[in-house]
Amino acid sequence: MKFIDEVNVLVKAGKGGDGIISFRREANVDRGGPDGGNGGRGGNVYFRGDSGLNTLLAFHYQNKISAKDGESGKPKNAYGAAGADEIVKVPLGTLVYYEDNLIADVIEPKDYLIAKGGRGGRGNLMFKSAKNTAPRICENGESGEKFALRLVLKVLADVGLVGKPSAGKSSLLNALSNAKAKTADYDFTTLVPQLGMLKYYDKSCTIADLPGLIAQASEGKGLGFQFLKHIERCKVIAHVIDFGSSLKDPILDYETIKKELKDYNLNLEALPHVIIANKSDQEIFATNLKKFKKAYPTLPIVAISALYQKNLDELKAAIFKMLEQANQQTKSNVVENEIAINITLDRDALKIRKLSENVYEIESKKVLNVVEKIPVSSLDNLWRINNKLKKLGVFELIKKHNVPEGATIKIGNFEFDWSDEE
């Protein structure tokens, strides 16, 4: 399966159903009153975290997501049905961005509200009053929220295996877990992150084999640089280093990877690190291990052979010990700060601009909402639009800019001819 970890999507919640104008028409009911029902709400769009997914590939082919619209109200005060919600599965670890602002971090297998459906419009029954017993007033349903979003996947793994190409990371992942990562005796066998489940007695954790890193990976060199972001999610970083070759220098390899991680993100240096000295079955292994321990006497190091699966239990014990310490550290530092989805628009300034000779456009979210919400289906509704535009300062703004009589004023798809008559 192709690995995709960043996509752009267009999300659109459902429009609310329209309210209607209706009056009772029944036998033996003289002058029946208003009974127009409200429209149903538009459907919401949710992202659902799914541990069974590990790529955003589905959005690569289908990047438009929309929920159903609500139905219009009906006579006899019958409400329209609500639009069906759209629930989309995404991998755990998916970050949702709107204009570079993080609005959701999908880290749990639950539903995250991404776009709210519009409210249903009110029918004329809702406008009945002592002064107006037979209102010919109703509202259209509100538009659902619509956003252009960027999804970024950062693999959720407890332990990240990092190292130079051909260090044996894929072989180790296969030996430790149920994964079946491709292995071969050449560089860059692993082209995308591979996940596996590591079990040790009654404990378990996820482990990720990340593509091999080379010098200046943090600056974009090699294949591994584009996957460095996945390391940020890990709680423990495990350096897999080839100690079994006379052509490789384990100390230099470790220092190279350490520098790239630091250059990419300073916070990675603060995570627990363990050195996995691989290829203990080779003759030169002991010599290289001795040199490394002399250079870094305090670093935790475990000698193993991924190929022959030697000393893996000791490695598992060391990993889970470090994970436990990392989890305790996280608990002591954690601050409850769930990301709230609150996409706010700029302050709503009332503006007017000239489009052409005798054609002007009003720009304001509030004003646009008025003309979208109130249908021009009755004289009462037209008067209502007129009063609201006046209260919002539209007419005063038009006068201030000396717009000539008879000029066309556009507000979205709504337009009228300007007259200064009260």
Curated annotation (Swiss-Prot):
One of its GO terms (molecular function) is GTP binding. Its EC number is 3.6.5.-. GO terms for biological process: ribosome biogenesis. InterPro entries: G_OBG, GTP-bd, GTP-bd_Obg/CgtA, GTP-bd_prot_GTP1/OBG_C_sf, GTP1_OBG_dom, GTP1_OBG_dom_sf, OBG_GTPase, OCT_dom. Residues 342-420 form the OCT domain. The keyword Hydrolase applies. Residues 157-324 form the OBG-type G domain. GTP binds at residues 163-170, 188-192, 209-212, 278-281, 305-307. Monomer. An essential GTPase which binds GTP, GDP and possibly (p)ppGpp with moderate affinity, with high nucleotide exchange rates and a fairly low GTP hydrolysis rate. Plays a role in control of the cell cycle, stress response, ribosome biogenesis and in those bacteria that undergo differentiation, in morphogenesis control. This is GTPase Obg.
